[in-house]
Curated annotation (Swiss-Prot):
PANTHER family: ALPHA-1,4-GLUCAN:MALTOSE-1-PHOSPHATE MALTOSYLTRANSFERASE, GLYCOSYL HYDROLASE FAMILY 13 CATALYTIC DOMAIN-CONTAINING PROTEIN. This is Alpha-1,4-glucan:maltose-1-phosphate maltosyltransferase. Maltosyltransferase that uses maltose 1-phosphate (M1P) as the sugar donor to elongate linear or branched alpha-(1->4)-glucans. Is involved in a branched alpha-glucan biosynthetic pathway from trehalose, together with TreS, Mak and GlgB. InterPro entries: GlgE, GLGE_C, GlgE_dom_N/S, Glyco_hydro_13_cat_dom, Glyco_hydro_b, Glycoside_hydrolase_SF, Ig-like_fold. The keyword Glycosyltransferase applies. The record marks D480 as: Transition state stabilizer. Gene3D superfamilies: Glycosidases (3.20.20.80), Golgi alpha-mannosidase II (2.60.40.1180), Immunoglobulins (2.60.40.10), Phosphotransferase system, lactose/cellobiose-type IIA subunit (1.20.58.80). Belongs to the glycosyl hydrolase 13 family. GlgE subfamily. GO terms for molecular function: hexosyltransferase activity; hydrolase activity, hydrolyzing O-glycosyl compounds. Alpha-maltose 1-phosphate binds at K262, Q322, D357, N394, K534, Y535. It catalyses: alpha-maltose 1-phosphate + [(1->4)-alpha-D-glucosyl](n) = [(1->4)-alpha-D-glucosyl](n+2) + phosphate. It comes from Chlorobaculum tepidum (strain ATCC 49652 / DSM 12025 / NBRC 103806 / TLS) (Chlorobium tepidum). The active site is at D393 (nucleophile), E422 (proton donor). SMART domains: Aamy.
Amino acid sequence: MKPEFVLPAPIRLDRPFDGRRRVVIDRVFPEIDGGRFPVKRVEGDRMTVEADIFTDGADTIVAELLYRRKGEAAWSAVPMTHIGNDRWKASFEVGAPGMCEYTVQGWVDHFETWRKGLQKKLDAGQDVSLDLRIGATIVELGAARAKDEDAGTLHHYVGLLSVGGSDAAVEAALSEGLLAAMRRSPEKAMATLYDKILLLQIDQKKAGFSTWYEFFPRSWSEEPGKHGTFRDCIKLLPRIARMGFDVIYLPPIHPIGLTKRKGKNNALVAGPDDPGSCWAIGSADGGHTSVHPELGTMEEFEAFVQEAEAQGISVALDIAFQCSPDHPWVKEHPQWFRWRPDGTVQFAENPPKRYEDILPIDFESEDWQNLWIALREVFLFWIGKGVKIFRVDNPHTKAFGFWEWALGSIREQYPETMFLAEAFTRPKLMARLAKGGYTHSYTYFTWRNTKHELQEYLTELTQTELREYMRPNFWPNTPDILHEELQGGSRARFIIRFVLAATLSSNYGIYGPAYELCEHVPYPGKEEYLDSEKYEIKQWDLDRPGNIRSEIAMVNRIRHNNPALQQTSDITFVKIEVSQGQEHDQLMGYVKCSPDGANIILTVVTLDDRNTQGGWLRFPLEKFGRPHTERFTVEDLISGRTFEWNGEWNYVELNPHQMPAHIFRVNLPS
């Protein structure tokens, strides 16, 4: 039976109109595109919701945040707190991965309104006999709603209040016992329920904090020039684990086409021994659900995944929905591709560039439903082999509706699945992919290099609505991108960009071993590696002098030991001055704090990889409720040294040839 091809729509609550519902609920936050898309959190996070809630006049109101797992009937309720100016707030701890729903409701509390009015009249010395009898009527209605013991308690209070203006009646009216019993039996018949049920996507913990390492399996044979295998890669796992990575990302592991195969450095004609680009997927040996024969068997791949998991590492697979001309789909499903007037299949183009070894899939095919099913089956196949994380190649060049349908339906079956969107494209496209189901997003971090650029970009990612649904994953390099910042070959520059990625974002990755070996030679005139591993098998010397493997391992240990660095959004940039009133443009500092406030990390990085830089740093003591003159200590987790700081302004200095960064753990007096 074919699946239903329906995209989600905002869930609106069409309750019959009743003019007696006086409470107004407005500006619920977070809410993405009117409830069209889910907010995202990670299991164990707290989900905080705010809303404007008010009514006419001065009556007291009560509000609740409601939440439940999608598909459940009953709601859990959390009382909301008034935080000023008719703004209300509440939170709850999210559970296991899956989809949740939440909304808000509020109602007039006639008992609280009456009780407050009674107290004011008593304070003014007025007669309250009639008011007490009015209160008895309100409490009697509460008794009718109450259950078991509370019903009897409230009937008792009705008797006391009905007497009128006696001291006993007044005492009963203001008693905590009556208040507690009435709060347990609220009058919700005329409650206003927000007109939308909003969605909350809960992801596995690695969605919030992960450390990625990309490598090409074919380059890891112990025999020079020989094609590496999954068995060879198992031997790499301890080294990768020691560096502190918990996600291994493999470029496509499928059979590679022969037709129009690319040669070394993307040459149009391949030599007899050139392995081709692994993104030219498909040959007589199979397509997207097959492994390249020279890498090994499917059983050996599964063994690799299992061994990685045993060492605390998840395996992420690259999914590239494109085909070589030799892919079985070209013959089996020609309707999924575009054909030119001369009868040849349309290859990929970005005029004037031509990519004749790759065929794009036609998402306007008349057979689009079967196409969608087949593409989704690729994910499901690899999930069946133990893969839970996918990096998707160029998703912005495929139909957005497909991603929303496919990722949503996959997540319904396998809620722990993660998807990284490799989309270096326009901001609105990147945002839509994140809204439509992608767990992580590649970013513009690679091209943000000055202090102003970095701070402006991080502010956009963490202080706007983007923070509610788009999780950045920072990569200082990829097999496709060697930014000019790294082309100078400075070891310090590689450490600088690494530390920035690892401490600005809780999710980051590197393409290795090119990065830890400070590989920096570009193809002339391009942001690409010379002799790119995309087109050839490399033989790496992992112990090459000048590598930064120990620095990577150290910073990753710091990340794992400090919860403040395991989140992205709580970041405060600090002022660093070269002289009074003059901002330092080469020293950048930022503070992160764990959700419970117990772990505070201050990172200071020099952006100058050649010269020593120093300046006066202002630590934001007021953020932590401390006076500007507070004395405290900071421990540099890189050097192991501890410094005593006196007040908010303190001097910092970095020599890039020693270490271009401080990662301070801030210890404020208890």
